[in-house]
Amino acid sequence: MVAVKALLFACTLRTCVFKPCCDMAIFLIFLNAFIWSSSFALSKSAMEAAAPLFVTGSRMVLAGVVLFGLLLCKRESLRLPRPAIMPIVLLSVIGFYLTNVLEFIGLQRLSSSTACFIYGFSPFTAAFCSYVQLREVVTWKKLGGLSLGLVSYLVYLLFGGSEDVAEWGWQLGLPELLLIAATCLSSYGWTLLRKLGRRCESLSMTAINAYAMVIAGVLSLIHSAVTEVWNPVPVENPLLFLQAIGALVIFSNLICYNLFAKLLRSFSSTFLSFCNLVMPLFASFFGWLLLGESFPPGLLFAVGFMVLGCRLIYHEEFRQGYVLTSE
């Protein structure tokens, strides 16, 4: 029953996306960020029940199959144009497979709020990817905003955000590096998806996501079979695994991935990444609610400075016409 309601909710969201100049579109962006921020806590719960690569592959394959089923019910075309084959494969490997594998491995030793804050680096990587892939101009005003936000980001990341200021220290370890790599690859993937949506209008964003999820899921399961112990499957708590995977598929893969992809037709990936800077606050809430994690007091300060820095960028985005334009 919950799954049916969530799917109906996702369909309702999709009908509202193509009104880029109304308040509803902005509301959907922040609603999407609120829902998506729960995925960090849900992912940690899933990894308590099963191996990380198996979790990644299972959710991706299941979500892709569900999306294909929805497309078949709507009788949408699933034929891949020849020019779209290699970009979709590239999107699958970089934007879905590598991003999710690195994220899940890094999450094993990071709190959900810290991991989500590291993903706050995405506006900067998205701006760079948009410049390289879409030839979107980066002005001096944008660079100033990037610099201000980047300084705030690095101060928090390197010196920590623990409750006791005296405990702050160098905290750039392997988990943080994995999450940073996942952030960069994610930004590249979203920019590639936006570029692909422009070039292949005959193929819906949902269909592109479905293909990418299935391919990435199969790669993750193969990776899991090679590196993780299957006896018969790498699941320790089947009930918790099914609950966490079900929630991840519905909220992250079916609702958030597809809504974000739809929004990319009307907003730049840089602007959407900027709006997602509120996600660490939401993730802290879900981490407290679902996992009993404490709220790091330095997080609010760091996010505030990142938002101030990024405001400079988005004044330029509006002026240049990259935001709130129909495509």
Swiss-Prot record:
UniProt topology in membrane: Multi-pass membrane protein
UniProt subcellular location: Cell membrane
Keyword Phosphoprotein: no
Regulation: CCCP treatment reduces SAM intracellular uptake by 50%.
GO cellular component, one term: plasma membrane
Keywords noted in UniProt: Cell membrane, Membrane, Repeat, Transmembrane, Transmembrane helix, Transport
Pfam families for this protein: EamA
Chief location: membrane
Ranges annotated as spanning the membrane: 22-42, 53-73, 85-105, 114-134, 143-163, 165-185, 202-222, 240-260, 271-291, 294-314
Ranges of residues in domain EamA: 34-157, 189-313
PANTHER family with a match to the protein in the record: INNER MEMBRANE TRANSPORTER, S-ADENOSYLMETHIONINE_S-ADENOSYLHOMOCYSTEINE TRANSPORTER
Function statement: Transports S-adenosylmethionine (SAM) and S-adenosylhomocysteine (SAH). Allows bacteria to acquire SAM from the eukaryotic host cell and to likely remove the toxic by-product SAH.
Similarity comment: family membership: Belongs to the drug/metabolite transporter (DMT) superfamily. 10 TMS drug/metabolite exporter (DME) (TC 2.A.7.3) family.
Name of the protein in its database record: S-adenosylmethionine/S-adenosylhomocysteine transporter
UniProt organism field: Chlamydia trachomatis serovar L2 (strain ATCC VR-902B / DSM 19102 / 434/Bu)
